[in-house]
């Protein structure tokens, strides 16, 4: 988390959401420089994965939430796929309260119990998870019908967005 208060990220809401899923919450990114660099993203995700202690790692940024009514469904569905290395969820990206798009499927759930060697070094920004040098993206992993809600710029002022 890099200056979530200043950036007007919904960090309190996100942490409450994560607490409803697990007690193993890993926060990374506090030491990042103010100026964002894309190559920091994969390193930060890897640090979070490495520090996580659970069988499954749910890799969500501080502006991404799961709806409280979907938590039980998600946990039940994950248990159906113990041999999958990763699972993708549809990402609904909000720009404003009434303006959003279904952006893509995000590979955010990773099976650390069976696949400890997952690395975040894939894709153009070197932040996508890989297994044996194969990117674990929407074309290679299982999809679940439980959306991730991304509130990217929803609560930010135009000035904050311009700085970011």
PLM region spans:
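Catalytic-site signature of metal-activated, phosphate-bearing donor transferases
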Residues: 39-46, 65-164
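Active-site-proximal specificity loops/subdomain of glycosyltransferases
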Residues: 1-59, 70
